[in-house]
C-alpha cells in the first residue's frame, strides 16, 4: 500500500497485517508516516496504490463504520460537553442521553454535561474525545498520540480505558513516542521509518531484540538520519 501527498511518498509499499483483538503500537521518528498510517486506515487519506482490508471488507465506507479515531489534538465543537456527545450520536445510530451520560461518567466527566467544551482542560478535552469515540461501539480504535502532554490522571484513565476496551474484544492501534507506554500497552509493534515498515513483531521481541539498526537506535533514543 502506498500513499502520496503532493509529490512526496508518505507510505511506501507497506505490507502489514494487524491481528484481531491486539494492541499495536506504531512507532518511529518524526516524519516516519505514523499519523498518515492511522489516517489512511480511517479513510481520511487516499491510497495511491494497494488496498486496505478489514475483516474481509474492502469498501472504505464499510471499514470506516467499524472504527473510531482519537486525535492528538481534540477536535470538538464549540458547544457543551453533552452537545458534543449528541452530535456524534446523531451521525450514527442514535443513543439515549442516559447512555451518553454513562460514557461521560466512564471517562471521569460526570456532571460536566452543560459545561462548554472550550472551557475544559487539555486532559478533559481528550477524555471527551475518548467518550465520543466509544459512542459508536467500534471494533477498531485508532489513537494518534492520545496522551501526549496530558496530566497523570487523564493519562492513566485513557490507558486503563484502552486496556478495558481491548479486554472486551476491541482491536487497538496507537502511535506514541513514549517507549514506556508502548511497553505497558502494546501486544505488537509496527516500526516505521521514512514511510517504510522496517519491523513488525510482538512487543517483547521488538524491545528485547530489534532486528534493524534503525530500530535499535530509536529504542536507544538516538537520532535517525
Where are these regions (language model features)?
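The feature captures the beta-strand-to-loop junction immediately N-terminal to the Walker
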Residues: 27-29
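Helix-to-loop junction immediately C-terminal to a conserved catalytic motif
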Residues: 42
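Conserved ABC ATPase "signature" region
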Residues: 97-112
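Conserved ABC ATPase signature
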Residues: 116-120, 124
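Catalytic Walker B motif of ABC-type/P-loop ATPase nucleotide-binding domains
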Residues: 141-144
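H-loop/switch region of ABC-family ATPase nucleotide-binding domains
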Residues: 176-177
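A short, surface-exposed alpha-helical micro-motif characterized by mixed small hydrophobic
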Residues: 182-184
